[in-house]
Design a protein with these regions (language model features):
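Residue-level signal for secondary-structure boundary elements
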Residues: 4, 8, 35, 71, ...
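Active-site pocket-lining segment
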Residues: 59-74, 78-85
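C-terminal core of ALDH-fold dehydrogenases
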Residues: 26, 76, 81-167
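Short helix-capping and hinge/turn segments at secondary-structure transitions, especially at repeat
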Residues: 1, 15, 32-36, 75, ...
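Short, well-ordered beta-strand elements within core beta-sheets of diverse protein domains
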Residues: 12-15, 65-74, 89-95
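ALDH superfamily catalytic-core signature
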Residues: 1-65, 116
Length: 168
């Protein structure tokens, strides 16, 4: 875990039910002592009651801390619904070898940046080549995503003519 207080940190991890029994113990071991895991009931069945139970509030919280909420989902549809309900619309990602599922995720998730098999930490104005990041917008009007100076300016068009007209 690195830089948990930044806006592109991961707060919630959705794990497909098909891989939970193999993946969750490996994840818990890798993150032991590095962060607090808050688990849904299915994840707690696998990892044990020593971990705190995740609450409804956890799914919508940006912790800015070393906390990771984990929820087990039954397939892409359930993951998409969770994201639709709780996403900040900043950055969302999917880790999968299934390209069709990944493309579907990238198409259907409403976020300023969507990722397939890449770190969400790339959502950054400097990384995207915009220069120093001045902000990040999750709105759909005007700029969306990391913004540099260019995204914050508006344009004024000066049009000079010699009597030209526009035909219908």
């Amino acid at each position: 875990m690195q830089r948990c207080s930044v806006c592109n940190a991961v707060e919630t991890l959705l794990v497909d039910t098909q891989i939970t029994s193999r993946f969750l113990p490996l994840l818990a071991e890798a993150l032991a002592g590095q962060c607090e895991l808050r688990l849904d009931p299915t994840a707690r069945e696998i990892l044990g009651d020593d971990y705190p139970a995740a609450t409804e509030e956890d799914w919508a919280t940006e912790y800015n801390d070393t906390i990771l909420a984990i929820r087990v989902v039954d397939g892409l549809e359930e993951a998409l619904e969770h994201i639709r309900l709780y996403s900040t619309q900043h950055s969302e990602g999917i880790v999968t070898e299934d390209r069709e599922e990944a493309e579907r995720f990238l198409q259907l998730v409403d976020a300023a940046a969507v990722y397939h098999n890449a770190s969400l930490r790339f959502t950054d104005g400097g990384v995207f080549g915009f220069g120093g990041e001045l902000g990040i917008s999750t709105q759909k009007l005007h700029a969306r995503g990391p913004m540099g100076v260019e995204a914050l300016v508006s344009y004024k068009y000066r049009v000079y003519g010699d009597g030209q007209i526009r035909s219908s």
